Amino acid sequence: QLHLQIAEGLPLVRIGTLVATPLNCLLVLEEGPVKTLADLKGRKIGFSVAGVEEALLSGMLSPHGVDLDDIELINVNFSLSPAIMSGQVDAVIGAFRNFELNQMDIEGEKGRCFFLEEEGIPAYDELIYVANPARMNIEQLRRFIKATELATQYIINNPEKSWDIFSGTAKELQNELNERAWIDTLPRFALRPAAFDKGRYLDFQSFLKNSGLITTEADISDIA
């Protein structure tokens, strides 16, 4: 989203990373008819957000001889797991591997993810901090990112205690799904939130340009 926002002229730059790997995946039923991405030809795929998810889907399917014209896209309005479990669609793009897989398992269905970064899509940081460079206080942001680093270290070193603290902030968090998702999210946290991988951001920006979602590529100094 940052690349799209920059292309639209929004005054934003990346200042840190919270989740350093993709969470998004293409989700199918483990025991369903889709064993490879080529099996999706002629099938229905659910999505929630037009644009980026279509580009991701196209990038994953095209190496397997499947074009977007070969599938039927259905907007399932963020009802990802129910759409696939009910048979409304054969797969969904935009499923978070730390949530939807657990949600399906709890409800008695096994899901399987095709991971974007293993299917030709450049890896990217899933969750980042952004700020307006004209208004940000550099010293305050440095302290904030340092606090994020210390918090992440504590979370990784103390997963049970950190879950108790996190779930204690809201009663609606205190359920099996969120506890499972918390555990699966732990290895995804950025241990060095201030670190910036220029190549990763440039690679994904090029992917977006080649997909037609942006027309020009920003200088790296305009990204972070």
Protein language model regions, located:
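Short, glycine-/small- and polar/acidic-enriched structural segments
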Residues: 1-77, 81-86, 90-98, 113-115, ...
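Short helix-capping segments at alpha-helix termini
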Residues: 63-68, 108-109, 172, 213
